[in-house]
């Protein structure tokens, strides 16, 4: 089953860019790691929301998204799929500001912005605008988001983060792992997400870091 999951993730993650997470890949992740209540810390364009709506084991999706335009599009998507009867709550704010109820989530799963690589808007709520230096972004956005995940997750439940270094910023993966471990998570795995195929160069992969909150 484990090998099948890994192979399927490579196939179904397809050729979408990271800012539009492929719903079929998200569905696989929900059905392997998820449960009733999901927090998507950076909703983006709705790929993980669509995966939630199609997954067999999910009941409530909580999302945070600071971009006004993206938020409006997500709300339209929620309305369009309301007939499925699943509960969806999306809040227009950054994940560093959202304070979840303690031990209320079965899974935290997202692909956050890669510092200033992906710019959904130039609003003051965007993490790269609020935290314009690498150090400010790591401590003001990334660390606070991971801390909120830890507080909100039930014991022995998972946080999955798809995030990668970029040619300009080499610190992103290392800092994500370091902070997660410092805050109490155990890293259990790293799985590969297929992003794209380049003519003659094969497929491009990004990591999805798999962390578990241990029992107290």
Model-inferred region functions:
Residues 1-216:
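Class I S-adenosyl-L-methionine-dependent methyltransferase catalytic core
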